[in-house]
């Protein structure tokens, strides 16, 4: 390449052709003594030695900057991550902090972050809008920061009392550090931590609009470009000096350059002049913007208003009718049909359609077109609200739900106010009478269908709301309005509805009543004589008991309903309500007389879920009444399956795609019961395991040596085996561990230890306090544990005693003598205990006919040896094969046939005798 191109002063040409430059060879030099050639990059860059303090503080300031950015955008997850990194970085800088003290910018961040988190925590509306991850991160960060700030409490308090002093101290420190550092380092390196934080704090608030900010940024960019062009002469001078010194001696590169005081002052003066010019331009621009803003305010007459992009400030109402059009019922009906034509079509704005219908209803009301038109429009508004979500799984938003409730209330108000109006699905649109008041008004529609859809939407809202949030509680308050709507519809249909419609609305009322415990009725039952009769009468007149209401509604359905499904649901709800209020015998008799257990497998899944819930409630009721065996039998099917959560409609279990695809999973999710109707699964399992313990432990003691002993509860045995497999047993913690520990104590006849494991503070909080009459249930449990422990003790140690007094047994188990007498008498009658009662001495005399433990072991050994011999003979016969002849045609494995053949052979004395055959085989082996 020509050397002409290498002579230019342009920096770009120098960098591109630096590789082509020809350097003079040294005279007499060898290959090993070539001169050291430094690249331009190495020549330009300067080595900067930074102290450990600067490194650590820069790391802290970078993390603080990231945290403040995350605070601006409310990214709590990022805040939490960076705060944890900041704590680790502060620990790394501990040696420097011990020498220099805690930096003020660190204290400032802790204080600001604490105030920021407290402000967010108190903002309940803002917390609701947060997503799940941000809300969780906010809670975690708040706890960690409060714990972390305890070490810096004094410094934070001092900073909050006088933050200005802290800023002044920081400034003094920064000035000292600037004076101590070299001017070259100050010009090349970035800001320190305190400078950065000070700059961030002193920045003016964002009071101007985005457009003004953009203009300011453009002006700054232009000014910076002007400065760059202005400094071009300096750069060209430096380039020329570089070219002149290019071929100088290489040793001069490593010599220290002497900088005079005059050169340093000239550089500083030039910097100050540039800064003053820049500040002057900024002040001038601010003054111009202030004048423009005042002119705009004077013209507009007010402040700026923040608007959403693309949304007009004034929303014009759509014109329903042309100007001057006379509003009559036919015209309104025609316009209604025009609006409904777009319903269901692709691209239709459903929200706009609802607004049009509401606007049309307002126009009809303004022009007094009659209640018939209003009812017809409101029916269509309700239908449009229900059609707003095309997806079945999507639930109504809160604003739509409120519109729905208000519209139904308005509709019922109109129907109650106009007794001459008839509505029904059987009315054809051509035969409707919407405005002729001389005849009864007739409108096509079904109020019951709207109410059933409203109830379905309410269920979907509850299913899709987090049950542990305040939003769920707020939504649950709407159930009172839903029940009020159903009750009003019930009154209306009782007057004008058919029998089928009355049964349907009665079932809706039942479904909102059956699972609720009537505390007022319960208190009236437990009321003492301290209350006067007038007070009791007043309490009874306030509201109808739920038991009376359920009885009246269900009996009407039993008598009038023609569909099996409504009657089945009513029976199950009635049984559930009886069981919930401890009416065990009524609930049991109704279940047995209905024969639902015979054909419930043919019902649809929601009815099966209701049946499972009813059986569980029936079992819990039997347990509260002390009927342990009935409780165990009622809960056996649900608990033994291991799918109680799924069978009760309270959640889905993890399954593979082969067992359940996504579509089936969506369908099953729609069948789930809302959270406020759930049955406590831990209470259910505890009731089942305690019932199994009270039945299984005495049975195991009575049949300890029985090889063919059956299991009453497989799940209970599984829990016992799990407890036995543990190498080291500590104190019980979970509910299951408490029941297993109580079972082991009952095996030994130690009823007090068993009671302490079943009834304690932990179990009371988890299970027993959830019952309405908790004290009565605990008393029943203690009595049952005493009785079953007595039976277990007699089964286990009867072989030890010749006789024992009933008084001693009563003292051991703290039972009355008649109770002990009753228990022992039942055991003797059922032939469970081989003994007799001596009435005069109140003594139980053991017969001693039962084998001892040694004898039982010997019997078991003999039985196992007999089985072993029989198996060996069968295997031996199988290995020898079958011989021809009459005697070998049968099954040789059948012992009865073999015995018959052996007897025949012994009688006949033939060659097939077993002894002869064995002798022949023995000789052949030799």
From Swiss-Prot:
Coiled coil: none annotated. InterPro entries: EIF3C, EIF3C_N_dom, PCI_dom, WH_DNA-bd_sf. It is found in: Cytoplasm. Residues 1-36, 158-309, 880-926 are annotated as: Disordered. One of its GO terms (biological process) is formation of cytoplasmic translation initiation complex. Keywords: Cytoplasm, Initiation factor, Protein biosynthesis. This is Eukaryotic translation initiation factor 3 subunit C. SUPFAM superfamilies: Winged helix' DNA-binding domain. Residues 165-189, 217-243, 289-302 have a biased composition (Acidic residues). Residues 675-851 form the PCI domain. Component of the eukaryotic translation initiation factor 3 (eIF-3) complex, which is composed of 13 subunits: eif3a, eif3b, eif3c, eif3d, eif3e, eif3f, eif3g, eif3h, eif3i, eif3j, eif3k, eif3l and eif3m. It comes from Xenopus laevis (African clawed frog). Residues 8-21 have a biased composition (Low complexity). Component of the eukaryotic translation initiation factor 3 (eIF-3) complex, which is involved in protein synthesis of a specialized repertoire of mRNAs and, together with other initiation factors, stimulates binding of mRNA and methionyl-tRNAi to the 40S ribosome. The eIF-3 complex specifically targets and initiates translation of a subset of mRNAs involved in cell proliferation. GO terms for cellular component: eukaryotic 43S preinitiation complex; eukaryotic 48S preinitiation complex; eukaryotic translation initiation factor 3 complex. Belongs to the eIF-3 subunit C family. Pfam families: eIF-3c_N (PF05470), PCI (PF01399). One of its GO terms (molecular function) is translation initiation factor binding. Residues 207-216, 258-275, 889-911 have a biased composition (Basic and acidic residues). SMART domains: PINT.
């Amino acid at each position: 390449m020509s050397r002409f191109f290498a002579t230019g002063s342009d920096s770009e040409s120098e960098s591109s052709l630096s590789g082509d430059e020809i350097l003079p060879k040294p005279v007499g030099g060898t290959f090993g003594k070539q001169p050291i050639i430094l690249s331009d990059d190495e020549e330009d860059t300067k080595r900067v030695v930074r102290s450990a303090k600067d490194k650590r503080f820069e790391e802290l300031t970078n993390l603080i900057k990231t945290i403040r950015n995350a605070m601006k955008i409310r990214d709590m997850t990022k805040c939490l991550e960076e705060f944890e990194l900041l704590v680790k970085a502060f620990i790394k800088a501990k040696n420097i902090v011990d020498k220099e003290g805690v930096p003020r910018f660190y204290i400032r961040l802790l204080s600001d972050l604490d105030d920021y988190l407290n402000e967010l925590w108190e903002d309940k509306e803002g917390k609701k809008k947060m997503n799940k991850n941000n809300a969780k991160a906010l809670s975690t960060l708040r706890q960690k920061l409060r714990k972390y700030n305890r070490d810096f409490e004094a410094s934070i308090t001092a900073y909050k009392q006088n933050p200005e002093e802290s800023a002044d101290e920081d400034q003094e420190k920064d000035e000292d550090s600037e004076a101590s550092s070299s001017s070259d380092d100050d010009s090349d390196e970035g800001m320190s931590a305190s400078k950065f934080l000070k700059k961030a704090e002193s920045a003016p608030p964002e009071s101007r609009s985005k457009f003004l900010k953009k203009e300011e940024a453009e002006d700054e960019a232009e000014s910076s470009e002007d400065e760059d062009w202005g400094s071009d002469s300096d750069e060209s001078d430096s380039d020329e000096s570089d070219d002149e010194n290019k071929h100088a001696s290489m040793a001069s590169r490593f010599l220290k350059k002497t900088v005079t005081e005059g050169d340093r002052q000239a550089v500083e003066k030039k910097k100050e002049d540039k800064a003053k010019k820049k500040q002057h331009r900024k002040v001038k621009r601010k003054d111009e913007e202030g004048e423009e803003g005042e002119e705009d305010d004077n013209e507009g007459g007010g402040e700026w208003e923040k608007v959403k992009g693309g949304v007009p400030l004034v929303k014009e109402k759509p014109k329903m009718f042309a100007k001057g059009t006379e509003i009559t019922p036919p015209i309104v009906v025609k316009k209604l049909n025009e609006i409904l034509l777009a319903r269901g079509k692709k691209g239709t704005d459903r929200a706009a359609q609802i607004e049009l219908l509401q606007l049309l209803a307002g126009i009809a009301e303004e022009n007094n077109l009659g209640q018939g038109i209003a009812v017809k429009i409101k029916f269509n508004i309700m239908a449009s609200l229900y059609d707003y979500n095309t997806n079945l799984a999507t639930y109504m938003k809160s604003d739509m739900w409120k519109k729905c409730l208000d519209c139904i209330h308005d509709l019922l108000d109109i129907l109650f106010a106009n007794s001459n109006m008839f509505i029904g699905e059987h009315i054809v649109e051509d035969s409707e009478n919407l405005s002729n008041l001389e005849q009864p008004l007739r409108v096509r529609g079904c109020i019951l269908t709207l109410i059933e859809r409203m109830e379905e939407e309410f269920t979907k809202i509850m299913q899709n709301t987090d049950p542990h949030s305040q939003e769920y509680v707020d939504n649950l308050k709407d159930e009172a309005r839903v029940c009020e709507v159903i009750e009003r519809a019930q009154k209306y249909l009782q007057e004008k509805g058919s029998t089928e419609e009355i049964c349907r609305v009665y079932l809706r009322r039942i479904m909102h009543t059956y699972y609720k415990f009537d505390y007022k009725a319960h208190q009236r039952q437990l009321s003492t004589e301290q209350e006067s009769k007038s007070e009791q009468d007043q309490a009874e007149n306030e509201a109808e008991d739920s038991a009376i209401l359920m009885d009246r509604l269900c009996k009407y359905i039993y008598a009038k309903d023609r569909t099996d499904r409504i009657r089945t649901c009513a029976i199950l709800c009635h049984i559930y309500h009886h069981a919930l209020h401890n009416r065990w015998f009524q609930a049991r008799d109704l279940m047995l007389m209905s024969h639902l257990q015979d054909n419930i497998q043919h019902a649809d899944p929601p009815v099966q879920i209701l049946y499972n819930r009813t059986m569980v409630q029936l079992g819990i009721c039997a347990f509260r009444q002390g009927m342990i065996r009935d409780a165990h039998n009622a809960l056996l099917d649900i608990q033994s399956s291991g799918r109680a959560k799924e069978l009760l409609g309270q959640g889905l279990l993890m399954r593979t795609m082969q067992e359940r695809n996504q579509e089936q999973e969506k369908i099953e999710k729609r069948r789930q019961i809302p959270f406020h109707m759930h049955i406590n699964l831990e209470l259910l399992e505890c009731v089942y395991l305690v019932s199994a313990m009270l039945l299984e432990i005495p049975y195991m003691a009575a049949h300890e040596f029985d090889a063919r002993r059956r299991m009453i509860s497989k799940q209970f045995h599984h829990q016992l085996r799990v407890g036995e497999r543990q190498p080291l047993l500590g104190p019980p913690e979970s509910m299951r561990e408490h029941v297993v520990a109580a079972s082991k104590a009952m095996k030994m006849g130690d009823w007090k230890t068993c009671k302490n494991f079943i009834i304690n503070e932990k179990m009371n909080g988890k299970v027993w306090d959830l019952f309405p009459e908790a004290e009565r249930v605990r008393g029943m449990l203690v009595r049952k544990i005493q009785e079953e422990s007595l039976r277990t003790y007699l089964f286990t140690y009867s072989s030890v005693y010749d006789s024992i007094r009933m008084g001693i047994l009563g003292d051991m188990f703290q039972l009355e003598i008649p109770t002990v007498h009753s228990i022992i008498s039942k055991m003797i009658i059922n032939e469970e205990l081989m003994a007799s009662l001596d009435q005069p001495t109140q003594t139980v005399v053991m017969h001693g006919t039962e084998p001892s433990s040694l004898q039982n072991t010997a019997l078991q050994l003999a039985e196992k040896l007999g089985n072993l011999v029989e198996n060996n003979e069968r295997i031996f016969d199988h290995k020898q094969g079958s011989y021809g002849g009459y005697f070998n045609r049968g099954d040789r494995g059948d012992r009865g046939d073999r015995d018959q053949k052996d007897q025949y052979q012994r009688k006949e004395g033939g060659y097939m005798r077993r002894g002869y055959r064995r002798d022949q085989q023995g000789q052949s082996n030799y």
